[in-house]
């Protein structure tokens, strides 16, 4: 019985130490979450403003050339059907906004983590992507993968998938300069025709307890809202000309969208890590509580046995 009590005490001490570690990790993840969540919210506001400005700038030029109520403009039916070459001379950068006539290859920029202990964060990304790749294979589509995060990169390579680029080691609070190589490579491969469209696949942070897997079309840029019903209260002074401005703004806009996805995914990763460590700490407390109950019962049984033996010995002496 004494050996059993000793084993229980060792188990309790071991699990308590594990619980202390997971609680410390929960607190660290919470601090990281607060930082990236604030940055993510601020960057979303910035990105929305950039999108609105680019959309308004391009709309105003198209409206100016066609006239707000012309038949040609009304027949566009949205930005996807517009031939931008009729309005802008963007050269090779035209493909940033103009869908290619034939899609020969599709690129997927997949964002995962570099480590475990983040709950189902990585497994959900991989599960959803394998479903997408399975559908693409069934349709004989050529797929090229850009993997951000060692977990996804290693898994996809083991599955013999076409990983054309991989990057690991994104910091807990990523900056644009840090991930510049990822962003520039993604855009460069698209402009060079390695793939004809690019989707960014990542986990969107909703709140601490909720996240959602997203597949967003990044290239060609589809978030430009060309709408002839928009009011045009802003007057732009464009120097030197609209084409030069767009040649600078459009690449920056496309890169900012990719960075926004990376920042959002990192926020979701911290939230998942914090939730997982919180759950682990609670489980440790529950196990310790159960073991302490078991220990107390074992002590009571030992004391009862000792008392019985003492009484039995006393009776034998009478």
Curated annotation (Swiss-Prot):
Keyword annotations of the record: ATP synthesis, Cell membrane, CF(1), Hydrogen ion transport, Ion transport, Membrane, Transport
High-level lineage: Bacteria, Bacillati, Bacillota, Bacilli, Lactobacillales
InterPro entries per the UniProt record, alphabetical: ATP_synth_F1_ATPase_gsu, ATP_synth_F1_gsu, ATP_synth_F1_gsu_CS
Task performed by this protein: Produces ATP from ADP in the presence of a proton gradient across the membrane. The gamma chain is believed to be important in regulating ATPase activity and the flow of protons through the CF(0) complex.
Subunit structure: F-type ATPases have 2 components, CF(1) - the catalytic core - and CF(0) - the membrane proton channel. CF(1) has five subunits: alpha(3), beta(3), gamma(1), delta(1), epsilon(1). CF(0) has three main subunits: a, b and c.
PROSITE patterns documented for this protein: ATPASE_GAMMA
Sequence similarity: Belongs to the ATPase gamma chain family.
Single GO term (MF): ATP binding
Record's protein name: ATP synthase gamma chain
Cellular localization per UniProt: Cell membrane
Keyword Cell membrane: yes
Keyword Ion transport in record: yes
């Amino acid at each position: 019985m004494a050996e059993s009590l000793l084993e229980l005490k060792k188990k309790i001490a071991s699990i308590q130490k594990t619980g202390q570690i997971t609680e410390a990790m929960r607190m660290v993840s919470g601090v990281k979450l607060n930082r990236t969540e604030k940055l993510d919210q601020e960057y979303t506001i910035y990105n929305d403003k950039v999108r609105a400005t680019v959309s308004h700038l391009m709309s105003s030029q198209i409206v100016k050339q066609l006239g707000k109520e012309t038949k040609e403009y009304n027949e566009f039916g949205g930005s996807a059907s517009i031939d931008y070459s009729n309005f802008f001379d963007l050269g090779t950068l035209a493909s940033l906004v103009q869908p290619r006539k034939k899609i020969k290859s599709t690129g997927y920029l997949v964002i995962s983590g570099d480590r475990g202990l983040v709950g189902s964060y990585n497994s959900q990304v991989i599960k959803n992507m394998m479903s997408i790749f399975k559908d693409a294979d069934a349709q004989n589509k050529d797929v090229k993968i850009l993997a951000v995060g060692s977990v996804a990169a290693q898994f996809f390579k083991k599955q013999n998938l076409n990983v054309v680029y991989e990057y690991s080691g994104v910091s807990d609070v990523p900056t644009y300069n840090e991930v510049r190589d990822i962003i520039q490579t993604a855009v460069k491969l698209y402009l060079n025709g390695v793939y004809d469209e690019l989707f960014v696949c990542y986990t969107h942070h909703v709140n601490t307890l909720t996240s959602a897997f997203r597949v967003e079309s990044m290239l060609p840029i589809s978030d430009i809202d060309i709408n002839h019903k928009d009011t045009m209260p802003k007057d732009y002074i464009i120097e030197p000309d609209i084409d030069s401005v767009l040649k600078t703004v459009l690449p920056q806009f496309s890169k900012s969208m990719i960075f926004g996805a990376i920042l959002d995914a990192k926020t979701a990763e911290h939230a998942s890590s914090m939730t997982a460590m919180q759950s682990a700490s609670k489980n440790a407390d529950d196990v310790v509580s159960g073991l302490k109950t078991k220990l107390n019962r074992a002590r009571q049984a030992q004391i009862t046995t000792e008392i019985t033996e003492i009484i039995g010995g006393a009776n034998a002496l009478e």
